[in-house]
Swiss-Prot record:
Record EC number: 1.4.3.5
Gene expressing this chain: pdxH
Organism for this UniProt entry: Rhizobium etli (strain ATCC 51251 / DSM 11541 / JCM 21823 / NBRC 15573 / CFN 42)
Task of the protein: Catalyzes the oxidation of either pyridoxine 5'-phosphate (PNP) or pyridoxamine 5'-phosphate (PMP) into pyridoxal 5'-phosphate (PLP).
Protein name: Pyridoxine/pyridoxamine 5'-phosphate oxidase
Catalytic reaction annotation: pyridoxamine 5'-phosphate + O2 + H2O = pyridoxal 5'-phosphate + H2O2 + NH4(+); pyridoxine 5'-phosphate + O2 = pyridoxal 5'-phosphate + H2O2
Pathway as given in its UniProt record: Cofactor metabolism; pyridoxal 5'-phosphate salvage; pyridoxal 5'-phosphate from pyridoxamine 5'-phosphate: step 1/1; Cofactor metabolism; pyridoxal 5'-phosphate salvage; pyridoxal 5'-phosphate from pyridoxine 5'-phosphate: step 1/1
Binding-site residues, substrate: K58, Y115, R119, S123, R183, L184, H185
Amino acid sequence: MSANELTSGDFTESGEPFKLFAEWLKEAEASEPNDPNAVALATVDEHGLPNVRMVLLKGFDDDGFVFYTNFESQKGREILGQKKAAMCFHWKSLRRQVRLRGPVEIVSDAEADAYFKTRARGSRIGAWASKQSRPLESRFALEKAVAEYTARYAIGEIPRPPHWSGFRIRPTSIEFWKDQQFRLHDRIEFRRPSPVGAWEKVRMYP
């Protein structure tokens, strides 16, 4: 099945970017071999140099797109410093892409706690043991830290580390791209002046 045979109707007619994203993600979940929620996250350091890495989208609604991380990691420090970020989803099986960018806010403690409890126990231990993005002397040092926290939290619930939580990108721009023949692709961008503004829809040259 081609990308053009998916999503009923012409996606360029949609006026609701979050609803359209939900439709595309659902189709990616049925089509992608793994991790349809994987997304490239771009941040900028204090010198204006960009960094990009893959993360997993863990939620979205009309307020924005949520992912979780160690706030002491490179991406955490850069987001806390610049308070803005960008994402790019690419679903090769569908020949589609979604780009978005905007200011970033921290999710509530209740929201972060609720998600943290859904993680595998080993992943929760790892959130304590890993000094993410810091130099690591050896693999043994990491495994030792994991063993120490495993012993510390052998009984009962594992609390969420104070340095581990979620970010929500509140997009001011969302672009939907669909592959077409001869590189005459469809590009529709939704723009708004602020995270609470009204959307303007613009068709872009490929």
